[in-house]
Amino acid sequence: MRVLRTAIFALLIAGMLAFASGAGAALIGVYRNSMENKGQLAQILKLSGERCARGGSEGAFTITIGKATKECSYRTPVLGRDLEIGATMRLLSKPQVAKSVQRSMYLALDLRAGGGARYQLAVYPLQDKAQIRKVRTDGTIEYLDIEKQVAGIGGAEKPNQLRLSAFNITSGEEKGSAQLLAYVGGQLVAEANDPGAGELSGRASGFSLGSAKVAKGAGATVDDVVVRIPSPY
């Protein structure tokens, strides 16, 4: 039944997006999850990661990275091309995690995810750095924008209100390109246009915790997830 509900919801979103105008449109919320009960936690499904533990604590979804793993990713039930996702994420302070690894940890939002590829907003709580990046199916990363000394990024145990949108441009010289906008605490901190948007065929929306290094024991919480689409009205 869960698979059927997800499929129906995805078809509904696809139908609504057929009438949407893309970048620059007003947005309407189609999914919200405050992670307050087992039913809401169960709506979040694993997307990728070799050894990842999930749970719930004090009204939040928890992620713990396991042995020989660099990143753990999860998705919402919403599938679509032109979406915006927002969430409040916290990097947990873990004394057992080496300081060099903890410093390299990032909190991320993912759009157009599938087959290992995705657009990603990666925020580094201990470096005050934000990146918009394009991850391809072979694991290579194209950095579309990198911003340092970003005000508003909280450190370990601090809430980070993140938001990422990816909308295809529907007219003009850049028609077919994806416009990506990234926000921290309601402030626009990074943006990019990707003329190679067609390279990503995935449609999943979600979030990740990761590091460039193996990060056994690292953890994060995720709360107040919202997904929006361009309004067709």
Give residue ranges: language-model regions:
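Extracellular carbohydrate-recognition regions
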Residues: A25-L47
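Short carbohydrate-recognition loop motifs
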Residues: G49-K70
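Short, aromatic/His-centered strand-loop micro-motif at the edge of beta-sheets
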Residues: R136-R163
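Flexible glycan-contacting loops in extracellular carbohydrate-active proteins
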Residues: A192-D223
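Carbohydrate-binding surfaces in secreted/extracellular proteins
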Residues: M35, A87, G155-N193
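Extracellular beta-strand elements of beta-rich domains used
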Residues: M35, D223-V227
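Secretory/extracellular carbohydrate-interaction modules
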Residues: T64-R133
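Bacterial N-terminal signal peptides
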Residues: A7-F19
